[in-house]
Amino acid sequence: MLRTAYVNGRYVPGHLAMIHIEDRGYQFSDGVYEVCEVRDGCIIDERRHMARLARSLDELRIARPMPANSLSVVMHECLRRNRVRDGIVYLQITRGVALRDHAFPPTDTRPSVVVTARSMNFAENERIAAEGIAVITLPDNRWERVDIKSVSLLPNVLAKQAAREQGAREAWFVDREGYVTEGSSTNAWIVSREGRVITRRAERGILRGITREVLVGVLAAEGLELEERSFTAEEAYGAREAFVTSASQLVLPVVRIDDRPVGNGAPGSIATALRAKFHEHAERS
């Protein structure tokens, strides 16, 4: 239950948290966001998330509403007020409130800031990881700037719903050349028959996931070979392992793709080991 939200300079009860009807995030999806994992009251990889947030704001030419250290204070205060020890903190910044017009509003328009925090049942995540998840593949019909963490997520919503309706937990987008880009809310990985870990290069075809970034370091530390390249759905069908990564779910083994078993149909040893090692390499604040 959301006890308290931060909305434009004020901490307000969750049931009273409101935004203006002409907020550009509400009318145009003109905004960006970040979601950070929280463990033992600490924000995981806050520095990396704030760096990505700054990049997203700059790419959309949205003014920074406050310094990063002030945002950090707000996020930690939301954790305290909502009594969150293990969960997530959500931060959203939009271009602000202005008379509806597709073009940018006047330069003195103040960005809107919303921060919320909620607890999560990480024991349930562990159960899901132990069983592995199913994914489906769908044509990638998103805009090209998915490297920006925009609040405009309708294709992702439709993809996630399609997955749920087919008994899967995630959907992988596939581009026009037949290559997997990423999941609706995750980065996509496979492990080749030879044991090489493969994921698409972090370019404009995918979001540069923070968990993905940390995992690259984990792979190096563990002496595992990484190939940053595109792979097809067909290659994924024949992989030894597959998995997805995200801030709220860490590493989740994939055991079925399009109703075909991956490897022996059980969570792979590499994905399982990477999940266990993740927090040894992540930053806490």
Model region roles, listed by residue range:
Residues M1-W172, R176-Y179, E203, L207, ...:
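Conserved alpha/beta cores of soluble small-molecule-handling proteins
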Residues W172, Y179-A202, R208:
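Glycine- and Gly-Pro-enriched alpha-helical subdomains that act as flexible
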